[in-house]
């Protein structure tokens, strides 16, 4: 069983809400540098930025990061990850952790946790994290992905819908969470086995993945086991909007 792992940080220049997001300044550094620095504090043996944009390549080289230039036609971050794993020549059982390029506050311990979980669960080809849902607003928010696991910690399904739907309890009232139902929010950090990444992209999207816009459903569709654990530390939300950017700037410039 290998416990060593590589972090890959997919980073795209294009963004509908925040064009050039990876290079936006936060406390004197581009956002991608903050993400790379946090990932470098983890136990990863290697941290690599993956991008299709020459401007991001140059910025990463300037602060000393290893960077791989990828194709521009990838449909998803996982497709980009698979290309990088192949270019790096990673062994099929090597562990790769995907850290999003817009999470400058990600705790290094979270990266270590998801990698260690996959290493410890040889029956799984993916691992990810979750945290408890504590209010009905979050539960009914379609932008929050819910996850249900079996008694062994393996994912049964993910959905943007209310999952599971407590039929009887919600028939009476929807302003409080039903007792005894462990609602959980999926946290979008993944560890993969490198060989699995090549299988994943070869399958192509399935209708369920397309319906929910959730890539991990492609893995479940093909019978892949995904280990899910509660995060030891809940990571702060990433930077998706101008408001998020200002919030992170205030935290890092304080």
From Swiss-Prot:
Pfam families reported for this sequence: CTP_transf_3
GO molecular function: 3-deoxy-manno-octulosonate cytidylyltransferase activity
Keywords, sorted A to Z: Cytoplasm, Lipopolysaccharide biosynthesis, Nucleotidyltransferase, Transferase
Major localization listed first in the record, in broad terms: cytoplasm
GO BP terms: CMP-keto-3-deoxy-D-manno-octulosonic acid biosynthetic process; lipopolysaccharide biosynthetic process
Superkingdom assignment: Bacteria
InterPro entries in the cross-refs: Cytidylyl_trans, KdsB, Nucleotide-diphossugar_trans
Protein name: 3-deoxy-manno-octulosonate cytidylyltransferase
Classification via CDD domains: CMP-KDO-Synthetase
Pathway connected to this protein: Nucleotide-sugar biosynthesis; CMP-3-deoxy-D-manno-octulosonate biosynthesis; CMP-3-deoxy-D-manno-octulosonate from 3-deoxy-D-manno-octulosonate and CTP: step 1/1; Bacterial outer membrane biogenesis; lipopolysaccharide biosynthesis
Location(s), subcellular: Cytoplasm
EC number: 2.7.7.38
GO cellular component: cytosol
Organism annotation: Pseudomonas fluorescens (strain Pf0-1)
Protein family: Belongs to the KdsB family.
Reactions that this protein is recorded to catalyse: 3-deoxy-alpha-D-manno-oct-2-ulosonate + CTP = CMP-3-deoxy-beta-D-manno-octulosonate + diphosphate
Top EC class of this enzyme: transferase
């Amino acid at each position: 069983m290998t416990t060593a792992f590589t972090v890959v940080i997919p980073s795209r220049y294009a963004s509908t809400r925040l064009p050039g997001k990876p290079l936006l300044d936060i406390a004197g550094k581009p956002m991608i540098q903050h993400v790379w620095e946090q990932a470098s504090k983890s136990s990863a043996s290697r941290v690599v930025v993956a991008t299709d944009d020459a401007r991001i390549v140059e910025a990463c080289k300037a602060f000393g990061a290893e960077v791989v230039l990828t194709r521009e036609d990838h449909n998803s971050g996982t497709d980009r990850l698979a290309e990088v794993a192949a270019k790096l020549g990673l062994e099929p059982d090597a562990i790769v952790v995907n850290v999003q390029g817009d999470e400058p506050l990600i705790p290094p311990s979270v990266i270590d946790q998801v990698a260690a979980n996959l290493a410890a669960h040889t029956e799984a080809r993916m691992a990810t994290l979750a945290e408890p849902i504590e209010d009905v607003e979050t539960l009914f928010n379609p932008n929050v992905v819910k996850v249900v696991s079996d008694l062994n910690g393996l994912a049964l399904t993910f959905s943007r819908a209310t999952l599971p739907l407590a039929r009887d309890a919600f028939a009476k009232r929807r302003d409080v969470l039903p007792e005894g139902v462990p609602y959980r929010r999926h946290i979008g950090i993944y560890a993969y086995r490198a060989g699995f990444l090549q299988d994943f992209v070869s399958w192509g999207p399935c209708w369920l993945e397309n319906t929910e816009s959730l890539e991990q459903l492609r893995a479940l569709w093909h019978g892949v086991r995904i280990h899910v654990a509660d995060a030891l530390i809940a990571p702060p939300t990433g930077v998706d909007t101008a408001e998020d950017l200002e919030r992170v700037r205030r935290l890092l410039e304080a």
